[in-house]
Amino acid sequence: MNLIAKLEQEEIERALAGKTIPEFAPGDTVIVNVNVVEGNRKRVQAYEGVVIAIRNRGLNSNFIVRKISSGEGVERTFQTYSPLLASIVVKRRGDVRRAKLYYLRERSGKSARIKEKLVSKDRTAAASQE
């Protein structure tokens, strides 16, 4: 491992100190809690939507979440290892066959729905035992 990769790995570990980032994939509905500073006040803002893309680039990894806000599509890019991210909660698993769901931008209503991924009972029991 070269020096840059080693430094990057140390920064990732420092960013994850005390935080856990759950496994999520494109198509999943997530709730991203973001620390927002307004003047001298700090609060947590929740942003819920569908993950349409994940970009894995080490420390520069990010993901795009899309939601419909009052009839208008809104996309927001989050840095995976940002100190502004308070937490990420996976609300629903989506069953998709693409890594990038940019086609959802042109769709609205029922055609923009994503099927839910059904997890078998064996996997659920194994996951709860771990």
UniProtKB/Swiss-Prot annotation:
Keywords: Ribonucleoprotein, Ribosomal protein. GO terms for cellular component: cytosolic large ribosomal subunit. GO terms for molecular function: structural constituent of ribosome. It comes from the Bacteria. One of its GO terms (biological process) is translation. SUPFAM superfamilies: Translation proteins SH3-like domain. This protein is located at the 30S-50S ribosomal subunit interface and may play a role in the structure and function of the aminoacyl-tRNA binding site. Belongs to the bacterial ribosomal protein bL19 family. This is Large ribosomal subunit protein bL19.
